[in-house]
């Protein structure tokens, strides 16, 4: 039963991701900031889709953090620092099919508080 629930959740997330994928595009001047969350960790990266390159990233696993709201705020602070070192002030936020709720919303709010615009 639990596996079928998880399969349905993953299928719905994939549908949301596919629906949005054609509308969001990142460049070197305005990169796409995408997030990924697992049950244990939270990851984020700024991507230039023209070059297919990652411009900045933050990894909660490397920082020894979990995937709760308080730890995600620390990942957002690290991401803001990495974006500032790459001279990036504005990004296009790609929630990667996740609902804008919980840790994804906390991450976005913490990035805005750190001065990143989107």
Curated annotation (Swiss-Prot):
GO terms for molecular function: 5S rRNA binding; structural constituent of ribosome. GO terms for cellular component: cytosolic large ribosomal subunit. InterPro entries: Ribosomal_uL18_bac-type, Ribosomal_uL18_bac/euk. The keyword Signal does not apply. Keywords: Ribonucleoprotein, Ribosomal protein, RNA-binding, rRNA-binding. SUPFAM superfamilies: Translational machinery components. PANTHER family: 39S RIBOSOMAL PROTEIN L18, MITOCHONDRIAL (PTHR12899), LARGE RIBOSOMAL SUBUNIT PROTEIN UL18M (PTHR12899:SF3). Belongs to the universal ribosomal protein uL18 family. Part of the 50S ribosomal subunit; part of the 5S rRNA/L5/L18/L25 subcomplex. Contacts the 5S and 23S rRNAs. This is Large ribosomal subunit protein uL18. The lineage of its organism: Bacteria, Pseudomonadati, Campylobacterota, Epsilonproteobacteria, Campylobacterales. The gene is rplR.
């Amino acid at each position: 039963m639990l596996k079928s629930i998880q399969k349905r959740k993953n299928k719905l997330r994939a549908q949301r991701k596919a629906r949005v994928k054609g509308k969001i595009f990142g460049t070197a001047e305005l990169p796409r900031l995408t997030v990924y969350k697992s049950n244990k960790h939270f990851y984020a990266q700024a991507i230039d889709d023209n070059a297919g390159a990652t411009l900045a990233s933050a990894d909660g696993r490397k920082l020894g953090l979990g995937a709760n709201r308080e730890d995600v705020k620390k990942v957002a602070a690290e991401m803001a620092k990495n974006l500032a070192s790459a001279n990036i002030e504005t990004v296009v936020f790609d929630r990667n099919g996740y609902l804008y709720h919980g840790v994804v919303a906390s991450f976005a709010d913490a990035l805005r508080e750190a001065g990143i615009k989107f």
